Regions:
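N-terminal nucleotide/polyanion-binding subdomain common to many enzyme families
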Residues: 1-74, 195-222
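Hydrophobic/aromatic beta-strand patches that form the interior of the parallel beta-sheet core
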Residues: 4-6, 34-36, 81-83, 106-107, ...
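Short, solvent-exposed amphipathic alpha-helical segments in soluble enzyme
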Residues: 20-24, 98-102, 123-124
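Short clusters of hydrophobic/aromatic residues that line enzyme substrate/ligand-binding pockets
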Residues: 49, 54, 92, 100, ...
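S-adenosyl-L-methionine/SAH cofactor-binding core of RNA-modifying enzymes
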Residues: 61-112, 117-118
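Charge-dense polyanion-binding interfaces
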Residues: 87-88, 168, 216-229
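Structured adenosyl-cofactor binding patch, chiefly the S-adenosyl-L-methionine
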Residues: 116, 120-167
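Internal, active-site/partner-interface "lid" segment
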Residues: 141, 153-192
Length: 229
């Protein structure tokens, strides 16, 4: 899987890849993440990428030329999709993550300041994605959420692909509770069913826990799950 990220702050993207699972996935060649800085495509000596909005208003707006030229400079693979990180986009979820994992290439546009000149949307025509109903200072953190989530779906990123299959939301439910050593800590014990080696009972227990946890913590997800049964 190849990710190409248009960002004014490449270091924010690359630094995330220097640790833990993402570093291993990168080093093993499971994923590659390239950063393209629109500032490198400006036409003036000051490398200006933003300007005041027509019609007035607060903040600075990202100019179309640097972003469109930077995007056009990205080599597009045949099986590719382009995303724009924006609070106006469709809410990102596990279903979308699974969809994106089927592509060879995901190109991501990260905004900053007051936002994009509307012509960037009109020319590039990206799929717009949001990670929630709140505003951040830039699109880099949302882009990293997408990269991290999608990478987990790709065989070779995790030690076992089953780890991703057991994640919360993979079947519409939250993940079951997990335990490790010691068996008892400060009076809190590991459920006995997890210690008896009966895999059928363990599977039933975990499914029951997933249902109860989803019902209590995310009744909206529980309702969707019930209606799909």
């Amino acid at each position: 899987m190849r990710f190409d990220v248009l960002t004014l702050f490449p270091e924010l993207i690359q630094s995330h890849l220097d640790f833990s699972i993402m570093k291993r996935a990168k080093d093993d060649g499971v994923i590659s993440v390239n950063t393209i800085n629109p500032r490198d495509f400006t036409l003036d000596k000051h490398k200006k990428v933003d300007d005041t909005p027509y019609g007035g208003g607060a903040g600075m707006v990202l100019m179309p030329q640097p972003y469109v030229d930077a995007y056009n400079n990205v080599e597009k693979l045949e099986n590719s999709i382009t995303l724009m990180m924006t609070p106006q986009g469709e809410p990102f979820n596990d279903k979308i993550s699974n969809e994106l994992a089927k592509y060879e290439q995901v190109i991501i546009l990260c905004g900053h300041y007051e936002g994009y000149d509307e012509r960037i949307r009109e020319i590039i025509k990206p799929r717009e994605i949001s990670i929630g109903d709140f505003v951040l200072t830039g699109g880099e953190l949302p882009a990293l959420c997408v990269i991290d989530s999608v990478s987990r779906k790709i065989d070779g990123t995790l030690g076992k692909i089953e780890s991703a299959h057991d994640d919360s939301f993979s079947d519409g439910l939250l993940e079951y509770p997990q335990y490790t050593k010691p068996r008892e800590y400060l009076g809190y014990k590991v459920p006995e069913v997890l210690l008896n080696g009966n895999h059928k009972l363990i599977e039933e227990f975990r499914m029951q826990q997933k249902i109860e946890r989803t019902k209590n913590k995310r009744p909206d997800l529980y309702e969707k799950w019930i209606n799909k049964k």
